């Protein structure tokens, strides 16, 4: 852990978790739509 810029570290972590959340929502939407249309 570097104490020079901890704010940038948390911003990177938030961005990564945001991308994972969007990916999860996208996958769930695809599965749900395929379940509905079949």
UniProtKB/Swiss-Prot annotation:
Q: What is the protein's membrane topology class?
A: Single-pass membrane protein
GO terms in the biological process aspect are:
photosynthesis
Keyword hit for Membrane: yes
S-S bonds: none
For this UniProt record, the keywords arranged alphabetically read as follows: Chloroplast, Membrane, Photosynthesis, Photosystem II, Plastid, Reaction center, Thylakoid, Transmembrane, Transmembrane helix
* Chain segments annotated as transmembrane: 17-37
Question: Where is this chain's protein located in or outside the cell?
Answer: Plastid, Chloroplast thylakoid membrane
Q: Which InterPro entries match?
A: PSII_PsbL, PSII_PsbL_sf
Q: Which SUPFAM superfamilies match?
A: Photosystem II reaction center protein L, PsbL
Any one Gene Ontology cellular component term annotated for this protein:
photosystem II reaction center
Question: Record's family?
Answer: Belongs to the PsbL family.
- Quote the subunit structure annotation: PSII is composed of 1 copy each of membrane proteins PsbA, PsbB, PsbC, PsbD, PsbE, PsbF, PsbH, PsbI, PsbJ, PsbK, PsbL, PsbM, PsbT, PsbY, PsbZ, Psb30/Ycf12, at least 3 peripheral proteins of the oxygen-evolving complex and a large number of cofactors. It forms dimeric complexes.
Function of the protein: One of the components of the core complex of photosystem II (PSII). PSII is a light-driven water:plastoquinone oxidoreductase that uses light energy to abstract electrons from H(2)O, generating O(2) and a proton gradient subsequently used for ATP formation. It consists of a core antenna complex that captures photons, and an electron transfer chain that converts photonic excitation into a charge separation. This subunit is found at the monomer-monomer interface and is required for correct PSII assembly and/or dimerization.
Listed name of the protein? Photosystem II reaction center protein L
